[in-house]
Amino acid sequence: MRGSKNIKTGRDGMKIVIQEPDLSNGFDEADIFNRKKLFHQIVRLIQSSPQKSLVFALDDKWGNGKTTFVKMFQSEIEKEDNYAIDAIYFDAFENDYQSDPFISLSSLLYSHVESKKTKGKKVGDKILSGIKKVGSNLLLNGSKFALTAISGGIISSNKIDGIGEVITDSLKSDVEGFIEDRIKSINNEKKDINDFKESLKEIITVTNNKTLIIIDELDRARPDYALDLLERIKHLFSVDGLVFLLVMNREQFEKSISCRYGNIDSRMYLNKFIHYWFSLPKKNRILQACGFR
């Protein structure tokens, strides 16, 4: 199947029709930059690694074809059964309207398991139960939500900065009681997280494949959402059989880290989450001049 047409206008006003490549066939003739070699390199790492969770990152500049590569990657995986990998694509930029990336990621995996029909229903039910418990805990642990809830709406989430003018002695007592309850329930929260992670481990028993989650546009997503997503992967999704490929412009993403955490070593911080870094093979300058991205 041929790709769509993209019409561009040059400086002289002449319209140029560029045939957008069809990415649904994987690395076929559309692979003009010979990036299938990188595909095989990543696949071999996934296949040869133990079941422990892995996090890869693809770092390159904007416009160099990262999205094209990962979509071809996914298509290549889908057209061959012998890779023993399921690939799921997730656009962080399109989903950053959500308050917490946990829901985004967990619902993605739930849908993946549910697509296996009867075989995946039992595991899907376990995952859904875990999503509800862990998700509600995360929601309650969010200070803005918690204060809004226990104040009966007196303190709205957009007025947290003026909290000193609102809290009364009675409300202060409610806040203290809420904090005490959260402290007492910490062990239950840990159990909920452990149960959720155990349910994720069962995905591979349903699919017989490792699951690769490709997270694209991480550097373009809302900074707090993108950084929370990293934390969620590390603490909640780091289980046997799950592999992540984070797609970003590293330099830009490190600026988001510095903006949130101040004067820290952003590069070292990022390396805490990522096991292997990759970059795209350099493109031919002549092809680049012709408009290929």
Describe these PLM feature segments.
Residues 60, 91, 150, 246-248:
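Glycine-rich, histidine-containing beta strand-loop boundary motifs that form or position
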Residues 6-41, 76, 180-184, 197, ...:
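The catalytic "switch" region of P-loop NTPases
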Residues 70, 75-202:
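P-loop NTPase nucleotide-binding core
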Residues 53, 120, 284-285:
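Short, flexible/disordered secondary-structure transition segments
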Residues 1-94, 103:
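Walker A/P-loop-proximal flanking segment of P-loop NTPase domains
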Residues 65, 96, 221-224:
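Residue-level signal for short amphipathic helical patches enriched in basic/charged
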